[in-house]
Amino acid sequence: MSRIENESGFLSSDAASVGSEDDKVEMKKRNGTIPKEDHLKSMCNAYQSIIQHVGEDINRQGLLKTPERAAKAMMAFTKGYDDQLDELLNEAVFDEDHDEMVIVKDIEMFSLCEHHLVPFMGKVHIGYIPNKKVLGLSKLARIVEMFSRRLQVQERLTKQIATAMVQAVQPSGVAVVIEASHMCMVMRGVQKINASTTTSCMLGVFRDDPKTREEFLNLINKR
């Protein structure tokens, strides 16, 4: 029998940080010797330049504090670069003799497209089959947050979440599906308001066993 949760509770902890080499370089920049205040100041100057180059008056009342606000917002949008997986899990990995599917679905996700720096948002569904260890359920949502709060593409985000789950609890299998709407397709370019993108990453038994994969997909689509 499968277990379905909608973002609550607890699971497991065994990991190091994951991601591409580019991710690690960016994390080093944010966690390194450059003070946060210096990052913020440089970003404020950059936003001031952008506002001026679109033809606006930087001294107009409504724009006086916009560079600072925008810089602080961007720092928040990309705070995932400051996170490390082992710290995020915080020992929430538990020994448990459970070998049936665990699913946390409809995890809300917001990220920034690395190509245009505009948002994409949607829902993440994660399933895994434990191998003697389970992870605190809320940690699945935190893993999503860690990787979505970076400059991303949906395909890589999907894989990073799945890989983090493998590092966290070494399960028999992991499945991740993301359904998202991209503002780069809505606000510019083809301007298709109702278009959505679905990506998946299936590892272990979810990749090897069609019946297990089908069970997961049926359960996340059940309302």
From Swiss-Prot:
Functional pathway: Cofactor biosynthesis; 7,8-dihydroneopterin triphosphate biosynthesis; 7,8-dihydroneopterin triphosphate from GTP: step 1/1
Coiled-coil region: none
Q: GO cellular component terms? A: cytoplasm
Q: What is its EC number?
A: 3.5.4.16
One GO-annotated biological process of the protein: melanin biosynthetic process
Q: Which PROSITE patterns match?
A: GTP_CYCLOHYDROL_1_1, GTP_CYCLOHYDROL_1_2
Q: What are the cysteine partners in each disulfide bond?
A: none
Q: Which UniProt keywords apply?
A: Allosteric enzyme, GTP-binding, Hydrolase, Metal-binding, Nucleotide-binding, Tetrahydrobiopterin biosynthesis, Zinc
| Alphabetized Pfam families for the sequence | GTP_cyclohydroI
Give the top-rank taxon of the lineage listed in the UniProt record for this protein: Eukaryota
Stretches for region Disordered: 1-28
**Enzyme class (EC, first level):** hydrolase
Any one GO MF term held by the record is: GTP binding
| Record's catalysed reaction(s) | GTP + H2O = 7,8-dihydroneopterin 3'-triphosphate + formate + H(+)
User: Which residues hold Zn(2+)?
Assistant: 113, 116, 184
Q: Write out the similarity annotation.
A: Belongs to the GTP cyclohydrolase I family.
Which proteins does it associate with, and in what oligomeric form? Toroid-shaped homodecamer, composed of two pentamers of five dimers.
| Free-text function comment from the UniProt entry | Involved in serotonin and dopamine biosynthesis that affects movement, mating behavior, foraging behavior, and cell migration.
Protein's name according to its UniProt entry: GTP cyclohydrolase 1
Q: What is the lineage of its organism?
A: Eukaryota, Metazoa, Ecdysozoa, Nematoda, Chromadorea
